[in-house]
Amino acid sequence: KPKVRYNTWCSKQHIIETKLLPYFKNLVMRDITPRDIIQWQNSMREASKKNGGEYAGTYLKTVQAQLSSIFNHAVRFYQLPNNPVRIAGALGQYDSDEMLFWTKEEYMKFIPTMANKTYSYMAFELLYWCGIRLGELRALTPADIDFETNTLSITKSYQRIKGEDVITKPKTKKSIRKVVMPDIVAK
């Protein structure tokens, strides 16, 4: 637990409790075969269709990676002969879908709809023109804004974890940065 961020821990715990244990809880690890894994993969695909849509391939990959890491741990430390997840093969896709961004034309059509909503208008202006993430925007404080240099200091992020508002460090050191605000935003 201490080696990962709290949000990561919560995500892993959720996957184990809702996606892995319901299927595998009555099985002994050493008796689980690649065939069992393939049946679980099929049940994951079916479950996502029953819920009105399909899980994203990257989410399925994340769920399977969690299962595989549990088996890897057993192979490494408890003499399990092999990892049946590796033998069974991939469940989800390994590349995420390309991110979609508004063109300037699309944004310019949208932003007038926020004209009477001052806070929303400013939020969208910062998000679009500065290219910051929503969690970074929500974590900004007045001390992070320098109007003399027209910069934002991005040093933290907002997350909602288990119903609580939490300010966290960014995931990576590269996420800590200074962002220049265009004049249109700084005014």
Residue ranges of model-derived segments:
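Basic, Lys/Arg- and aromatic-enriched nucleic-acid-binding interface segment
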Residues: 53-57, 61, 76, 80-140, ...
